């Protein structure tokens, strides 16, 4: 498949008047092969603590295999998504950048080497990660609480 549906729960937590930026708590819930499977998972999550208190914070995004800032060719997912991200802590918040979604670990590694040279990430060279997610397998199995 050339595309999958990425499901996240992105809850607003704070606004900084100093920087005029919003902070969110974002949970990656999984990658799904169809819009219907994504919607079915939302219904399951709505039964869990935390999620049912913030029912409007679910977001679906279509992601294509092997496309990023360096590659425009669409590949084929084969049961897994290899997710390339960059994360660093600025002293107050974790900052996460979604860099790409790949059909193979090797394709993700190739793009990672390109991103390492990007001035935006050069000060945090250890912040890169490549994680494998099985398509149609929920990644978050419990609810959550807020305080």
What name fits each language-model region?
Residues 1-28, 70-98:
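Short aromatic-glycine-(Arg/Gly/Cys) micro-motifs in beta-strand/loop hairpins
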Residues 32, 102-105:
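Conserved aromatic
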Residues 37-43, 106-113:
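Short amphipathic alpha-helices within nucleic acid-binding modules
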Residues 26-27, 44-81, 114-147:
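Short, mixed-charge low-complexity intrinsically disordered segments
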Residues 31-41, 136-139:
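A short, hydrophobic secondary-structure junction motif
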Residues 8-16, 44-48, 87, 113-118:
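Short regulatory "switch" loops immediately downstream of catalytic or recognition motifs
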Residues 30, 62, 100:
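Hydrophobic/aromatic beta-strand elements that line small-molecule binding cavities or substrate pockets
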């Amino acid at each position: 498949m050339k595309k999958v549906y990425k499901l996240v729960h992105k809850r607003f937590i704070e606004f900084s008047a100093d920087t005029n930026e919003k902070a969110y708590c974002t949970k990656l819930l999984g990658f799904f092969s169809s819009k219907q499977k994504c919607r079915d998972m939302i219904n399951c999550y709505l039964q869990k603590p935390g999620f049912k208190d913030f029912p409007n914070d679910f977001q679906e995004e279509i992601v294509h295999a092997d496309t990023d800032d360096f590659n425009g060719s669409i590949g084929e997912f084969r049961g897994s998504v290899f997710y390339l991200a960059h994360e660093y802590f600025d002293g107050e918040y974790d900052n996460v950048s979604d860099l790409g979604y790949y059909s193979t670990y090797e394709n993700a590694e190739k793009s990672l080497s390109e991103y390492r040279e990007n001035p935006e990430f050069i000060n945090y060279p250890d912040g890169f990660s490549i994680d494998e997610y099985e398509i149609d397998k929920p990644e978050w199995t419990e609810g959550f609480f807020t305080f």
